[in-house]
Amino acid sequence: MASALGIFIDRNIIKYAKLNGTKGKLKVESYGMKYGENHKELLKQIIEETNSSKNSVVINASEIHYEETSIFSMLKKKDYDKAVEVAYEEIVDKQKLRPELLEYGYILSKNPADSEKLHVLLGIQEKGAMETRANLFGQNVMLYSQMPIGISISNLYGSPLPALIVNIEEDTYITEIYDSEPIKVTRIATGTRNIINTINNEENSISKSYEVLRNMVLPTDDMDQISFEGNEYAPIIVSEIMKIVSEIKAVINKRPGIYKKIYITGTGATISNVETFIEKLIDDVECDILRPAGIEVQKKVAIKEYVDVNSAISLACEALRI
């Protein structure tokens, strides 16, 4: 049975999930997280502890640059690659980038604004950043790919309906899903980073700071007069969530009437009531926690634990859902 290990690398935390099975039926074999900034040592521990030296490993890419363009839908499929390449070269030339230093991938989907064209979402990476990240692993590790997390997170969405996936990690990634495919990714420098830093100033422990965050409860009764009584970290949490809400509204307003559903995932999704809190601040949308679609979960494991490592689960799917 095929197995793959997904690893999501952030500044102060590394999340991992090992999956096995086939495209139609995947199961989480093991999962967890490591804390700290010595990524090379932490990754070595993860590979050893999950016995994954002979399995495909998928990690999140660093320094991703997203662009959107389009190609004509009447083209034959065999001509898609060339058409996208031409569009990519135009973008590179316009922005005066150096193509020899870059690599790119793309996803095609229906164009919500023009039925005669296909929407193209480009993910552009610097080769140097890819090499630096690959060097965190030993030569014996089977590094399958480096995937943009804003794209791979869509692996866990099982509906054809348009939606936003808001992945709240140290930064936040807002992925727009249309016709089952990601069409745009917005990365914002607001997420759990400031919250963790604030808590860590008191707790002096990154791992403990994350546990404090996961045990937080957001108030939802009176949104006009939010009470911080008895919760010293609530102000910073509410402040960061409000910034994220503002960004979500901006995304929704750019495509009016399209998005009626928001899914929250990542570390931020483990804050109790976060989905209700966000839903009450945005008109005419439903907000829920993103449960990993198509993944067999163990009944004895709380869904909150899987949601916390959704970023890693979605990466592992890249090697198994082919």
Model-based region annotation:
Residues M1-K34, S53-A61, Y157-E202, S207:
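Gly/Thr-rich phosphate-binding beta-strand-loop-beta motif of the actin/hexokinase/Hsp70
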Residues S62-S159, G294:
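Active-site neighborhood for divalent-cation/phosphate handling
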Residues P256-I262, I271-I289:
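ATP-binding/phosphotransfer module of carbohydrate and carboxylate kinases, centering on a glycine-rich
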Residues L26-N51, M74-Y80, I303:
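N-terminal phosphate-binding loop and adjacent alpha-helix
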Residues T50-H65, M142, R255-G268:
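Short glycine-rich phosphate-binding loop at a beta-alpha junction
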Residues G150, Y157, D288-I322:
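Glycine-rich phosphate-binding/hydrolytic loop that grips phosphoryl groups
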Residues N201-E202, R214-K261, G268:
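Adenine-nucleotide phosphate-binding core of ATP-dependent small-molecule kinases
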Residues E131-G150, D179-I226:
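Glycine-rich phosphate-binding loop plus the immediately following alpha-helix
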